[in-house]
A protein has these predicted regions:
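Membrane-embedded alpha-helical bundles that constitute the cytochrome b-like, heme-associated redox core
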Residues: 2-237
Length: 237
């Protein structure tokens, strides 16, 4: 079965940005409510977490649209939202990073050494490295998500860079796993059912894994879409 040719855009209409903003805010406030149900009321702590979770879900939607469009042609009309969702996910990692540096010393003061304020970050170096790689790769992709990006790189290299967004999602998964909550908190909840809903890490991880599973299925069924693209010499002339 031949893969559907995808459509890339370098600018979006205002309604697309509005809808994307609504989607992001819907995820954000849903997880604010979700944490409240789990006896974690609205605080700087939940704000930081839900900012990141909403970003991860927007990235998940952006990544899922490509494979879905190759399985179901009805999704082709939604492909322009890959850009708005992806850029929103990337830009909203900025307040997440800022909030991390603000709230961590307040939330976990016992984890910080009086003599060395970066002790928590050293102790959790892998978590920090995965977060750092996520942020840096996100920003690189953002820089080249404009018309000048494809002119500088050529179509094929540009498409390869855009596909590295899946690597961003893998970094996010590793970032989550390195926090030590998975599967420990899941098992604890299954044993106690002390809250009406599972830990927030459960729906977050499922949301992150879904587009990766879809991409693997897409590669198995349709092959790599890059193989169908002509070389840069033909594209950038």
């Amino acid at each position: 079965m031949k893969a559907v040719k995808t459509r890339h855009v370098f600018s979006n209409q205002t309604p697309q940005w509005v809808i994307t903003t609504v989607i992001y805010m819907a995820f954000f406030f849903f997880f604010i409510w979700y944490h409240d149900v789990r006896a974690k009321p609205f605080t700087l702590f939940t704000t930081e977490k839900c900012t990141a979770i909403a970003s991860a879900y927007c990235l998940a939607l952006a990544l899922a649209l490509g494979p879905l469009s190759r399985f179901f042609a009805s999704f082709n009309g939604l492909l322009p939202y890959r850009r708005t969702l992806g850029l929103t996910a990337a830009f909203m990692t900025i307040p997440h990073v800022i909030l991390v540096f603000i709230y961590l010393p307040l939330k976990f003061p016992e984890k910080y050494s009086v003599d060395y304020c970066m002790s928590w970050f050293v102790d959790h170096w892998f978590t920090i490295v995965m977060g750092f790689l996520t942020f840096v790769l996100f920003m690189v992709i953002v820089v080249y998500s404009y018309p000048s990006g494809i002119r500088k790189l050529g179509k094929r290299k540009w498409m390869i860079l855009q596909k590295l967004a899946y690597l961003v999602m893998i970094f996010i998964v590793l970032h989550l796993l390195s926090m030590g909550k998975i599967p420990k908190n899941w098992i604890a909840w299954l044993e106690t059912r002390n809250h009406p809903v599972p830990p927030g890490s459960f729906p977050t991880m499922m949301g992150c894994l879904l587009p990766l599973v879809l991409k693997v299925a897409d590669l198995i069924v349709h092959g790599d879409s890059l193989a169908l693209e002509p070389g840069d010499e033909q594209d950038s002339g």
